[in-house]
Amino acid sequence: MNLSNFKRIALFFLAIFSCVSLWAETEAPEVEKSQNMGTEIDFYVEYNPLKNLTLFVGEEFYLNNLLIPEAELFDATYTSVGVNYKPHPNIALLGAYEFQYLNGGDIRHRMKLMVTPNVKINDYLTVSIRERFQMTYSMENMSYDWLLRSRLRLDGSIPNTPLYPYVYVEMYSPLVKNPTTYVESIAYGVGLDWVVDDNNILGIYYEFSHSIDSYYHLLGVAYVLQFQSYEK
């Protein structure tokens, strides 16, 4: 796929995201939306046995709204293990399993499959479109949830610095649970990664998402520890 064609596809997806977002706002019933805020803390360990292959384990901690005194601090924790493979420099494939423990005792199992094509616009910008298919099983409700998450992301780099900003928009589409609901929620995010050295990456990000009945603000921090056994 050449650059001009990928740009057209990316612009098409951006237009679709924008139209769906506006449609969701105009078609939603007049209900009072709740405002919620949370914090996410991520820790990942990645190992590269080959240049195009990454094995990873991760832990994500979710905290409730710290501005509400009566709210419980702990919300959920996600433990994941997976593999990321790049058959081509412009395509990434990912498969992962995630164990979730939620406040209240509910345990969930999630399987994730992703494909992410990308292309460099210039020396400083890269655009990607990621399709993520996930299945989540709730032990408490004994039910399955099938979801498709479509994300358009723009990654950048600041010349002569180890800083890498990015922005994205992501659409959550249920596949089975409610076929009449084409879009469950839409999220917009912005973040910044700091590549400290070859083995350490720090990140901070903010995400705003909205559904028919709620707004959600998420502030996150992340740390990635990387190892490799091949010569760069």
What are these regions (language model features)?
Residues 115, 217-232:
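Outer-membrane beta-barrel "beta-signal"
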Residues 35-39, 75-79, 107-111, 142-148, ...:
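Residues that define the transmembrane beta-barrel architecture of outer-membrane proteins
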Residues 51-57, 89-95, 122-127, 160-165, ...:
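Repeated loop/turn-to-beta-strand initiation elements of outer-membrane beta-barrel proteins
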Residues 43, 81, 113-115, 150-152, ...:
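Membrane-embedded beta-strands of outer-membrane beta-barrel proteins
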Residues 1-30, 228-232:
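Cleavable N-terminal export/targeting peptides
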Residues 26-84:
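Start-of-domain marker
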Residues 57-61, 95-99, 129-135, 167-171, ...:
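Transmembrane beta-barrel strands of outer-membrane/channel proteins
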Residues 47, 85, 117-119, 156-158, ...:
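Residue-level signature of outer-membrane beta-barrel architecture
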